[in-house]
Regions:
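Rhodanese-like catalytic fold shared by cysteine-dependent sulfurtransferases
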Residues: 1-17, 21-54, 61-101
């Protein structure tokens, strides 16, 4: 994976782990995503995924997830950011689900 992925390419992706790192998420999220603290991911020496696992991070607009994904790539993880974040996903008209569903 390169450093980022478009909303459309993510929607078509298989076998990728999607992580929501928004600090103040609304009640909706990208289907199949899981909520994690981005700052914890960036600082932790032990991560909840393997270095060869394909991971996409998303935040609200793409800024925080780009920075954190870059840090994790430098540490050897296969992590990219969703270009434009959750905002781009919604603007592309892609599905969202209520949290907890």
């Amino acid at each position: 994976m390169s450093g980022s992925i478009s909303a459309e390419d993510l929607a078509a992706s298989k076998d990728v782990r999607i992580i929501d790192i928004r600090k103040a998420p609304d009640e909706r999220h990208i289907p199949g995503s899981e909520k994690m603290n981005g700052d914890d991911l960036e600082r932790s020496s032990e991560l909840p995924f393997a270095s060869d696992e394909r991971v996409v991070l998303y935040c609200g607009s793409g800024n925080s997830c780009s920075r954190i994904a870059g840090t994790l790539r430098e540490r050897g993880f296969d992590v990219v950011a969703l270009e434009g974040g959750y905002k781009a996903w919604k603007e592309a008209g892609l599905p969202t689900v209520l949290r907890g569903i």
